[in-house]
Curated annotation (Swiss-Prot):
The keyword Ribosomal protein applies. InterPro entries: Ribosomal_bL27, Ribosomal_bL27_CS. This is Large ribosomal subunit protein bL27. Transmembrane segments: none annotated. It comes from Maricaulis maris (strain MCS10).
């Protein structure tokens, strides 16, 4: 009697969706309070002036202004928000 044993299932074939990490607002772009500037795992970029950090290390704007990226001594990257001087009305 012809017979073929059941084939084993493949152990591959899974992949997780991308996490959509990275810089969301680049240097020179204007932001309002609450805008996400960087989504990251760990502190690749540290918060500077007028920037807050969420529990998942997301950096966000605390004030209205323009995004500025900078490298400090030791190679640490920082992002801050410089308030835009409004013209006197």
């Amino acid at each position: 009697m012809a017979h073929k044993k059941a084939g084993g299932s493949s152990r591959n074939g899974r992949d997780s969706a991308g996490r959509r990490l990275g810089v969301k607002k680049y240097g020179g772009q204007e932001v309002i309070p609450g805008n996400i500037i960087v989504r990251q795992r760990g502190t690749k970029v540290n918060p500077g002036a007028n920037v807050g950090m969420g529990k998942d290390h997301t950096l966000f704007a605390l004030t209205e202004g323009r995004v500025v990226f900078a490298k400090k001594s030791g190679g640490k990257a920082f992002v801050s928000v410089e308030p835009i001087a409004k013209a006197a009305e």
